[in-house]
Amino acid sequence: MFDRQSIHIALLLWGAIFALIAALCMFMSRNFEREKRRWMLFMQLTCAVLLCSDALAWAFRGGAGLSGYLIVRISNFLVFVMSDLILFFFHGYTCFCLFHKSGGKDALVVWRIRAGYLTAIVGVILVIISQFTNLYYYFDSENFYHRSPAYIISLLVPMTGMLLDLTLIVQYRKNVSREIFMALISYITLPFIAAVALLFYYGISLINIAISISMILMFVTAMEEQDQNLARKEREATELRVSLMMSQISPHFLYNSLNSIYHLCDKDVGLAK
């Protein structure tokens, strides 16, 4: 019989598998814009590593021996680092979706874009520092993970980056379709709700599950948008071919008609009229 932890780990692993499949689809696809494809690929790969690491952290928590000691520490480190890296890649993906067609950006927008990248980088640096200072978490003698008093900083840093992205998404929402807008918003709203819940409840990876759901939504909407773009391009190509064919037929038809009238003028003026 499965207990709650087994179901929890299974959900994380299935989320990782889907993220890997999505990454493979992005890698094999040649129909996406190159930069958009790259950002989506990085997001899905990072999400897969995040979910796998989280599953290992839960599976081996309290495990004895050197392998359990190493796996618990490495996997927890990767969970925190990947969370900030996903924010970095999401920020890049968001900026591409919002601005790749609009051209120039004002100074305030440029500042927010740079601040978004910087926030994610600061988050990674703080995670590295925490490995030597127990800033975010520590492990007891039985190899169990525990939060440190400053754990909330690990939530506030990515939330700051998310709020920056939220201002960009809301301000420039007209630059993207409704579906893409909702998918981008989901990455901010779902983890934010999970983070608030996580402050009062510990025992399940609510934030990472929320991130995986938003990754699914972004992948699905990106594929749907690409299908629509391909259908539009195919329709435009068909219309162009028809137009070219008609442009070739019309002069030929006109020449034949005038030639027939010319000959009828000599034979039957009434019929020619």
Which residues make up each language-model segment?
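Hydrophobic transmembrane alpha-helical segments in integral membrane proteins
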Residues: 1-21, 151
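Short aromatic-rich membrane-water interface segments that cap or initiate transmembrane helices
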Residues: 2-6, 70-82, 143-155
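Hydrophobic alpha-helical transmembrane segments of multi-pass membrane proteins
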Residues: 12-31, 36-69, 75-93, 116-131, ...
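Alpha-helical transmembrane segments in multipass membrane proteins, preferentially the mid-helix core
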Residues: 21-27, 89-93, 155-175
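Membrane-interface helix-boundary motifs at transmembrane edges
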Residues: 27-41, 66, 95-112, 169-180
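Membrane-proximal helix-loop-helix units in multi-pass membrane proteins
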Residues: 89-92, 96-160
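Interfacial "cap-and-anchor" motif at the non-cytosolic start of specific transmembrane alpha-helices
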Residues: 168-233
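Two-component histidine phosphotransfer core
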Residues: 207-273
